């Protein structure tokens, strides 16, 4: 099976935990890492600097569309910052664990 990482930013820890618990609980993801970040970006012609959370979500490639759709339903941002990256290589037992942890 192929595997992917999904990267997403959220407004705060509460939103991150809600997304992580939903994805893992629904077996769409094996794991979600949450960490604090500072983002600088352009929004409506202004430069904005904000404290946010970033998430790295581990899943099977075939589930990425479902993961993205689920995140969109839980996110508060107008323009969701959601991307996926294919895992080219990884520890075989870890990748097997992703398979076993998702449906």
Where do the model's predicted regions map?
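Positively charged, small/polar-rich N-terminal and surface patches that mediate targeting and assembly
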Residues: 1-103
């Amino acid at each position: 099976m192929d595997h992917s990482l999904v990267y997403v930013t959220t407004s705060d820890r509460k939103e991150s935990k809600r997304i992580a618990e939903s994805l893992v609980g629904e077996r769409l993801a094996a794991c979600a890492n949450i960490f604090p970040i500072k983002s600088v970006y352009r929004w409506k012609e202004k430069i904005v600097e904000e404290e946010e959370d970033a998430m790295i979500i581990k899943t099977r490639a075939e589930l990425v569309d479902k993961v993205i759709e689920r995140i969109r339903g839980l996110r508060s941002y107008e323009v969701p910052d959601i991307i996926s990256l294919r895992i080219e290589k990884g520890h075989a037992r870890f990748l097997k664990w992703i398979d076993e942890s998702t449906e």
